[in-house]
């Protein structure tokens, strides 16, 4: 990947001037100027996903300049480098090939001259066989009973992705009950173990190195709990499987290495649900549905790699995001799924985006000080969010671009619930884009029989300025295929932005310092002696903790 400062490109300079020219033009005026705006500013994927980006502060010149920016920043070359297995994660000297995990085409993909696809397919075949045994009841626990509960123990990418997907695809789940334990807080594992029976519980320990502090702390506690009931260490093999690459540590734990599912250093944690880390997904929804999840992602990979920029959904969303955060002053993006099954979608991409693009050092090692990199990602399902934080989005002083996501078909057609849900979905983006003028507020009062004189003091509070940017993503139905495509769409959006931000999106050095300091502090917490080895604040906090515990 090349080292190109985006602010030094001709397109960036032109965009700065263009922003000034467009500054006083509202979204409403853009719709008035362009009668076919919806058709011109929306794209479809596989006739199952519609992405409408018309309610943004952009026109065709904006898009043209943003596409020029992508070209000047060598996006196409970077995309091919990723798909071809080049080591684009330079700080760790790794390829980035989560796309290979879902490559249904079986086209060879080379890393260091070796085709990785045979190994990928071998792990998938092993996962399929394992899932069939557990789901069918052939796999027995230590008392001869079939498995009823699966506990996935992992953190970060080993937890957020599998948890999000199993929740999103609950309509497809089988009889197995899934549990996810991530936090090193003992409460998380303790409360989970209260719900399960050691005779019928399978634990998946998800840690590439099998040394992750939080994961192994929880796994050891689960092991102790299990052995207290089973009283036989040889039975660990029937109740624990490992998603790891460290066979030595897995075996030491007591897990049969036949029940160890590998993945590779070219799979980043936050892009790993497509790998063996997704075993909990496959156990929950069945392997056929897991393959559909992969197929949807693969289809989006093909779209992203081959569609021209004008029709390229991930690239378009990425470029609009760059426009919003670097030219319009937005600092956050809200992800608002109008689907309760997607209640962890924003949390998943909070990690996906912020761990990838939350960087301040450019690819040449220099500090970035004249443009913004990754935005803050947050969100909640609709309509819950409407009764919580939408007030600020509508009438606050900050610009918050929003992605509204909704399925046209529901899995639970109860009464008129879905129509009411979707009426809110459509209404919110309309309200955010077009607002309500003072004249409209006054007209409402007059219609209600009020005189303008008696309401003049309240009128300003009921005005909505509008002109708030949104994308609307309408999915025909949330299925394994469409969910896979949606996830891959956002993955590639993050990639595009990282290329243009001139950063390395696939490392996460920012998580290391806190870990190092925690390892230093941990032994200091054992005794009763006063601590003085830190700053006065940290010393004071540790010493108060010791006094109170």
Curated annotation (Swiss-Prot):
A GO molecular function held by the record? carbohydrate derivative binding
Which reaction is catalysed here?
alpha-D-glucose 6-phosphate = beta-D-fructose 6-phosphate
Extract the InterPro entries matched here: G6P_Isomerase, G6P_Isomerase_C, Phosphoglucose_isomerase_CS, SIS_dom_sf, SIS_PGI_1, SIS_PGI_2
* Keywords for the protein's UniProt record, in alphabetical order: Cytoplasm, Gluconeogenesis, Glycolysis, Isomerase
Please indicate if the UniProt record lists Cytoplasm as a keyword. Answer: yes
Biological-process GO terms, alphabetical: gluconeogenesis; glucose 6-phosphate metabolic process; glycolytic process
User: Per UniProt, what is one Pfam family of this protein?
Assistant: PGI
- Residues at the catalytic site: 355, 387, 515
The protein's annotated pathway:
Carbohydrate biosynthesis; gluconeogenesis; Carbohydrate degradation; glycolysis; D-glyceraldehyde 3-phosphate and glycerone phosphate from D-glucose: step 2/4
Q: Which NCBIfam families match?
A: PRK00179.1 (NF001211)
Family, similarity comment: Belongs to the GPI family.
What protein does this entry describe? Glucose-6-phosphate isomerase
Q: Which organism is it from?
A: Histophilus somni (strain 129Pt) (Haemophilus somnus)
Q: Which gene encodes it?
A: pgi
